[in-house]
Amino acid sequence: MAIATIDGLEIAYEVIGDGRRLWALTPGGRFSKDYGGVRATAEALAARGQRVIIWDRPNCGASSVCFTGESESAMQADVLAGLLRSLDLGPAVIAGGSGGARVSLLTAVRHPDVASALAMWWISGGVFGNIGLAVTYCSPSIKAAWTDGMEAVADLPEWSEVITRNPSNRDRFLRLDPHEFIATLERWMSAYCPQPGQLVAGTDDAAVHGLAIPTLVVRSGASDPHHTRATSETLAGLIPGADLVEPPWGDREWVERMDAAAKGEALFDRWPFLVPRLIEWTAARRPDG
């Protein structure tokens, strides 16, 4: 694992493989690059002649915590673009699932110079899905800061991994003004709330429609309440020339992975099944010429 400093933040990353085509792979949730399925997907891509950067977003894994920006995903997208530029890598195929799909989309929209292509699956959307994200990612920290201050935030179970893996993160929390912290998380919370003209939280449909790179969208399952099928299909229709493809698994994949995760398995364990489809698509679309 290597560490890069991007805008004053410590960002943990690894480059896997030595192929000519570069991928930037981003997981969802607040999961690390070391979470089950992420590295395996990168290694499967590398085994097919690709080069892949996996990284810990701010607020994930061994990277620094950061509470700035209009939304958490926008902040992470800006850091990914900064990481690729600082390493003199790219442009890359920006790829990810769930929250990583949102970060990937925002990266391509906000920083077109680092994106040669875009691939997304399990794209969060819908009223239920987006409101759930707002509550999950913001509510516990807002409540803790409001009632007991920043030490209580740092003691929350959801931040235990980032503090254990990067102990300086505890000091980062304690240095934050609780009122400013609450204001930031309420802004992030608002960004998840469904708004007219925003299919994907945090980015306008008009900006998405302006994308001019090869784009792959994997259709979501009809049974998935968090990454709705309508979101994936509508997003593919918004992006000129986007390819909407069927997933390499059944309709209940997300539901079954949630059940498996409750038993200790990883949500992303089956992501490597996407690799043949990703390779076939890039071979056909030739994003890097």
Language-model features, listed with the residues they occupy:
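Conserved HGGG/HGGXW glycine-rich cap/lid loop of the alpha/beta-hydrolase fold
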Residues: 8-64
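Conserved alpha/beta-hydrolase "acid-adjacent" motif
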Residues: 224-231
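Conserved acidic catalytic loop of the alpha/beta-hydrolase fold
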Residues: 74-92
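Hydrophobic, aromatic-rich cap/lid helix
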Residues: 169-206
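Short beta-strand/loop motif that positions the catalytic acidic residue
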Residues: 211, 217-219
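Catalytic active-site module of serine/aspartate enzymes centered on a nucleophile-bearing elbow/loop
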Residues: 241-289
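Glycine-rich "HGGG/HGxG" loop immediately N-terminal to the catalytic nucleophile
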Residues: 55-73, 255-256
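Flexible "cap/lid" loop of the alpha/beta hydrolase fold
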Residues: 102-105, 109-146
